[in-house]
Structure formats: structure tokens, C-alpha cells
Amino acid sequence: MYSFELDKLKIELKTWEHDFIDKNKREPTRDDIKSLRTVRQMYKQYSTLKKKQSLQRQKVDTQESVELPAHKKDHDEVVEIGPTPQVYGKAISIFDMNLSPIKPIYMTFTNNIDVNNDNSKTISNESSPRKTILLKSSPADRTLVAEPISSVKRQLNFQMLNASSTRTPTSSPCKNRNGKLVEIKKCSPTINPPLESGKPSGYYGPNSPLKLDEENIHLNISLNSSTKRRLQIAYPSLQKTPSKDQADISTSFSPSPLIRRPLTKSLIELAREHTEIVKEFGVLQEEDIEEEEEGEEGENGYDEKNHEDDFGLEDELIRPKVVKDIFQEDDDNDDSQAREDTFIRKRPKRRKVIRRLRDNDPETETAGFERDVHKELVKLKRRKVAEFLGSTSQISDTEFEHDPEASSGVVSSEQKPTAKRKGRKKYNLVSNNFRRLKLPKKNRFSNGRWGRR
């Protein structure tokens, strides 16, 4: 309502202020506004409208903040319980589940007695309230009364121990046979508990230390168990020589909080493992010696060159791996030193090589000289031409002078340059891929764009 007039006045005042600044090059003051009557009235009108608008907004805010009273409906509504957790038709979150459900208390009234009379009311709080309702009264005479909601959380009450609130109790409360706490008596380790021979195990609390005496719990360790060896190490007085019957007892055990067992193996177990390792190494050494003897017998049929290669390996000698028994006496050390002095020849792996058979006959070796066919043909042509012209002596002499190798007709293999073998290239070039995969090149068509296909 007032917003339109306020906006209009604000525009007029701003236009006058800007005109005054452009004209006088300064902002208008109060004296300038008071001197002009029309401008002064516009400012007064603007201030009054502004106050009215603020008062109107405050009234609207107060009306919105007033809460309407909730009117309870007289008739009951049909409530459909959905899958969400609810208590009597009202949805609750999972964080409100610590509240126990409301326990109904059914009240029945006797016939022909006033409902308002308290003496005529009887409360049935039994485990099955529905049965009592059907037997005692009709639905018209029954009313439902709800108890206040109680929390599930329990609180410990140590007032029965007659201890101060600032002091923590040092003993657990006793219980009678029915499970109720005894307020007068205390259960302390120094005083004998009031326990008879036929009392149940629930007489004390679950964490009471006196429960051990009641149940007669003792720790018995049998000497035939798997922990005997651990105990002998921990207590030297229990150490005895192990018998043959107990030699094969399993050493597996479960961790116990009462007995500290060493995690390492015992000396007897280490000695057994050592003897087994010594036996295995002895068998392996015997097998190696047998294989070497068989190899020496087979090497007798080889040629002299192979024998020279074998004799060249005598420098590569190794000492045998001799496992020393730490449990043997010092008398056996001489035998072990004698074994260490022995040498075993290391036989390397050989590769089968097929060699060409060599013949030492000098006649067959000299007969294999190579001849140049082209030079032989040139020499024959020159002879035929010389015979036809009749000057065989002159041509043959000049031929022998300029070409002494052609006169003999033999080309020495030593003077002929041997073709160098091209080594394998380190990198595969891109051009090799073009040649191998038959890829098109840049200048593949000499005659125009399209060539022969």
C-alpha cells in the first residue's frame, strides 16, 4: 500500500539531489532543504510513510508467530501401521527406540457401583490382561490407563553398601536365592561369604571374584600334556631326560594367559631337525659322486680336443659343502677336516656340436683351389684369336707378362678379398617395415599417379 508512494517520492527526491549537485557541485545540506518549501514537505511525507510501513510489517510478523490451538477430535481415526517404526500410530526415528512401549493397565469396575468411587476400582496388572478382561468385565466397563514412559537404561544403586556417594564400592553386592540384592550384608574377600552347600551359582554377581571359590575352579597341569617341555625350560627343577614314549608328542599348543611359553623351538626339536638335514646332505653328496664316476667313464671315448677342454677345467675346483654337526664330540673334527681336503671337480654343461670330418691328406687339400671362370674364358678367347691371326707367341708373351695369374689359370684364395659378413643391426628401421609389410611409399608411381597393379 505504502510501497508505491514511497518509491515515487524516493525517485523525485533523488532527481532533485542530482540536479542540485550538478548545479552547485556539492551535496545539499539541511539549510538548503529548509529554504525550499516543496522539498521540505516531500522529505516529511517520506519519513511518515516509512514509519507506517515499518509498523505494518511488525503487526504481520506478530500475527504469524501466534500459534493456533490444536483442537482434539472427538472421534477416533483409523490408523494404518506402515513399515516404518511406530508407537501407537506415530512414526518415530531409530534414535528414539530406547523408549520402552507403553504398558497398558486395565481397570475393571464392579456392577452397580459409581465409577468415580476409588474403592470400587480394581486394577489387573497380570501377565495376560486380556483373559482378566474377558472374565471380569465387559468392554463397556473397561477403561485404558497408560503409565508414563520409562527409559530402558538402568542405573546402578550402591546405597545398599552403606558407602559414601564419592567413594567407589570395593566389593560386589550379594544376592539371595531369588536373585534380589541383599542390602545389609556385604561380600568382601576377607569375610567368609554367607554361602551354604546347596546354593545356586547365581548367588554372586557375574563379575564377583568370590564366584571362583564357589564353583571350586582350580588349575591342574598334567605332566603328559604338550606343555611339559615348555615347563621344563621355564623351571629347571622339572627337567628330566626325555623317554622314547614321549619323543613323538606333538608340540602344538594354544596360547595361555597363565603360563608364558617361549615362542622358539626347544633344543631337542632343533637337534632332530639338524640330524635330518645332515642325513639329506649326505645322500645328496653320494649321488653327486656316483654321477661324476659315470661321467668320467663316458668321457674316455671322446677325442683329444674334448679331453684338452676337460683338463682345462681342473682350475675350476670347488670344495664340497660339508655340514658340521655341532652336537658331535671333538673327536669327529679330524674326520670332517679330512673330508674338507678332498676336491670335487665341477662338470659344466656341454652343448652338442657337429663338426666336419677333417682329412690330413695333402694331395686332397691342394686339389681344392678355386678358379675364376670369367678369366679362363677370356684367356681361351685370346688364344683362339691369336691362333687365327698367326701371332700366338707374341700374344701369349704379353699375356704372361700382364696377367701372370691367367697363364697359370689358378686364382689364389688368399689374395681374393673375403666378403664381409654384415652384422645384425641394433635397431629395426622404419624402411624395413615398409619392405616387409609391402606398404606404399612416396614415389612408388613413376608414370603418373596410377601405376601398374
From Swiss-Prot:
Q: Where are the coiled-coil regions?
A: none
Localization, per the record, is: Nucleus
Q: What segments bear the compositional bias annotation Basic and acidic residues?
A: 302-327
Keyword Zinc among record annotations: no
Regions of compositional bias (Acidic residues) in chain numbering: 285-301
UniProt-listed InterPro entries:
DNA_rep_checkpnt_protein, Sld2
List where the protein spans the membrane.
none
| A GO molecular-function annotation | single-stranded DNA binding
- What post-translational modification does the entry describe? Phosphorylated by CDC28 at the onset of S-phase. This phosphorylation, specifically phosphorylation of Thr-84 promotes interaction with DPB11 leading to DNA replication. Dephosphorylated by CDC14.
Its annotated function is as follows: Has a role in the initiation of DNA replication. Required at S-phase checkpoint. Also required for the proper activation of RAD53 in response to DNA damage and replication blocks.
The protein, known as: DNA replication regulator SLD2
Question: Which species is this UniProt entry from?
Answer: Saccharomyces cerevisiae (strain ATCC 204508 / S288c)
Q: Which gene encodes it?
A: SLD2
